[in-house]
Regions:
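C-terminal motif of bacterial Sec signal peptides marking the signal peptidase cleavage site
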Residues: 42-45
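Surface-exposed, glycine-biased beta-strand/turn segments
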Residues: 173-261, 292, 301, 312, ...
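Zn2+-dependent peptidoglycan hydrolase active-site motif and core
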Residues: 245-283
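Non-catalytic extracellular/lumenal accessory regions of secreted precursors
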Residues: 47-114, 197-223, 228-230, 350-353
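Acidic, Ser/Thr/Pro-rich low-complexity intrinsically disordered segments
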Residues: 47-51, 62-63, 106-164, 176
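Short aromatic-glycine-enriched beta-strand elements
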Residues: 259-264, 384-388, 449-453
Length: 467
């Protein structure tokens, strides 16, 4: 089941970018329209994704946002920032490649949300696990969206993590980009770890074999190019058991000139029909139910395969033939281990040398900036051997490890000859936090562009223009 985030048409409050959720107030004004909305919701919730019941899409995030509005917190800078952070996580996610593992820090004194965008092929099941390390109990809103080509919808919510299990999984029915959004309650934070991986959605159909036994693939030419191969051929010795890849119903058992002895199974959950051909024996009868792993026949070379070594022709059909490879082929890929120093997580650091900043942690990353030695930055996440950094101007990116150090110890001390104002950020919109009188010391901790970051004799930190 999936939930269309079309607030304009379903809930009457405009697209996701609109300001101020009116979901519950809208419903209270018109109970009749609420009933119509509910019916329309279930009609629109077509089975485009397979989501286990504990992970069905929920409106917990929107309900929490409504509670902020009821408390008039949406009129405060803090409440507005929470909503904007959730939207930014969808509209400006980090592009990643699966499998992926990251440890990140969300400061409870700040308002944050994170988003990850990744591409998923049909036939795979995506498994997402979250871990929370926080001194306080908190709710982490974990929602999964599919990017939509419809500008009115923009995103389609397909799954939500169960709060107790902090786990989420789903099976797409189309090749598409998906976005995972993670956002805690207001004034809650800590260290988090997220693991996103992909696995085949059904079992391998030949006992004791794996994808290395597939020697002929979907789309390969047949009959001198007159037709295409609508399945995969899995080679094994004669009489090797053929297994039901999932719970299913036996719909047909028979014999034909091309497929030889065959069996058809119907997986109602996934709306697919599975075809097993060239069988030596058939061990099931039409109308019966089978469970995943049950023997339904044995490998042979009947039909037009009599001149080839024994093998199973396995096909999947859903409104036509589809490539079964990703449904059954093991991924055998683990995310790279996190080797960065977790002591840096959530801390201000400075560069030990000139550093190239890349736009993403994946193999297709591109350089987007270069920062000079002693530049100040904040470490917000660790993944493999990379650090995700936030620069003082709000830009972000990824840098390689072993190029940073804590920005605690002074690089040098300066005695100021003139009065200087210290600002909270290095920019024209900065706010003055304190003043330094002539003759006072200023410990230089780092810099960023035309500003110096440091600490006063009283221990106040901030930015001053380059001297």
């Amino acid at each position: 089941m999936e939930t269309k985030l079309n607030y304009k048409h379903l809930l009457g409050i405009g697209p996701l970018r609109s300001t101020g959720s009116k979901f519950l107030s809208f419903c209270s004004r018109n109970h009749g329209l609420l009933i119509f909305t509910t019916v329309l919701f279930f009609i629109s919730a077509c089975r485009s994704e397979i989501v286990p019941e504990p992970f069905l899409p929920s409106y917990a995030h929107e309900a929490y946002q409504y509670s902020l509005e009821q408390a008039n917190l949406d009129r405060t800078a803090l409440g507005r920032s929470w909503k904007e952070a959730g939207e930014n996580a969808l509209y400006k996610p980090e592009d990643i490649t699966l499998p992926y593992q990251e440890e990140f820090y969300l400061d409870p004194a700040e308002v944050n949300a994170v988003g990850y965008r990744f591409f998923v092929l049909r036939g795979l099941r995506i498994e997402i696990e979250m871990t929370i390390h926080s001194a306080d109990s908190l709710q982490l809103f974990s929602d999964l969206f599919r990017q939509s080509g419809d500008p009115e919808l923009e995103f389609t919510q397909v799954a939500s993590a169960n709060r107790d299990s902090l786990r989420l999984e789903f099976e797409p029915r189309r090749d598409s980009y998906y976005i995972l959004r993670l956002q805690p309650e207001l004034l809650r934070g800590g260290r988090f770890r997220v693991l996103i991986r992909e696995v085949p959605s059904i079992g391998f159909p030949v006992q004791g074999k794996n994808s290395r036994a597939i020697l002929s693939f979907f789309g390969n030419p047949r009959d001198a190019g007159k037709r295409e191969h609508h399945g995969v051929d899995i080679f094994a010795v004669r009489h090797t058991p053929v297994l039901a890849p999932s719970d299913a119903e036996v719909t047909r058992v028979g014999e034909g000139e091309i497929g030889g002895r065959y069996v058809w199974l119907r997986d109602q959950k996934r709306s697919i029909n599975m075809y097993f051909a060239h069988l030596q024996t058939q061990e099931v009868t039409p109308g019966t139910r089978v469970v995943a792993g049950q023997i339904i026949g044995t490998v042979g070379n009947t039909g037009n395969a009599r001149t080839t070594p024994p093998h199973l022709h396995f096909g999947i059909y859903s409104r036509g033939p589809i490539d079964p490879y990703h449904f059954i082929a093991e991924t055998n890929r683990r995310p790279a281990g996190i080797t960065g120093d977790s002591l840096f997580l959530g801390e201000l650091v400075r560069s030990k040398q000139t550093i190239i900043v890349n736009n993403s942690p994946g193999s297709g990353n591109l350089p987007i900036d270069t920062i000079v030695q002693n530049s100040i930055m904040k470490i917000t996440a660790l993944t493999s051997n990379l650090y995700h950094i936030l620069l003082p101007d709000g830009s972000s990116g990824y840098i390689a490890g072993n190029q940073i150090e804590m920005a605690n110890n002074a690089i040098k001390e300066q005695i100021l000859t003139d009065a200087v104002r210290i600002f909270d950020t290095p920019g024209i919109s900065a706010v003055c936090v304190t003043d330094i009188k002539p003759g006072e010391k200023f410990a230089v901790l780092g810099k960023f562009k035309n500003f110096i970051y440091g600490r006063t004799f009283e221990g106040r930190t901030g930015w001053i223009p380059s001297l």
